[in-house]
């Protein structure tokens, strides 16, 4: 494969790593041409394991025969760009990439109907906009037995660079889809919706009624404001996590991990 040493981030072929915004990388008008940036050898290898197609690679020159060597072999005949650490360090978040980045073709996502048809436990993210939280939620969901994620169209893109990085590549492992329908529509797929919210009629996360449900969609709200009243009112269950020391709630990423752990156990019990 061709290896090109660069001395400027304005070099041909490097704009995808340096100039293009996450919005431009997504390419809504032509999604088949969308691009994802995987950062660090671990995340790149996860993406390759999940079948993503590499477009080009950017790394420090010293990694050509080091951390990037096996990745270069796996990627086949794609352009490889190398530069000094001093040059590449000007890339946003570069210190977290371990010196290796890969531009990859954005994979096609299933429809929410397709995802629901194959799932028993899903998470619905309603207007969750923080990229760090998205990445952390996906990592917990993948690790704790959730089958997939549905995101309202005003949520952050899971393939945002920071979300990919925080998720440690699990955004490529966990099936996800955009949800462009009202939450009650999920009942048509056999799901009971579980809104995570503090309300007078909230039940505990370990309530026996939840254990009896074969298909559950746990609904998490945006940072700060939580779920809108309409989403809570439309839910089949309103659920809270018991707290101590007067603390009323957890960050959405932390709350999701607790919910996934409990619901993952319940899923095993209903198999």
Language model features by range: what are they?
Residues 6, 36, 126-127, 152-153, ...:
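Glycine- and other small-residue-rich loops at beta-strand/loop junctions that grip anionic moieties
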Residues 66-77, 231:
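Short, aromatic/basic amphipathic alpha-helical patches
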Residues 100-102, 140-144, 153-172, 229-271:
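Structured adenosyl-cofactor binding patch, chiefly the S-adenosyl-L-methionine
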Residues 74-93:
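A glycine-rich helix N-cap at a beta->alpha junction
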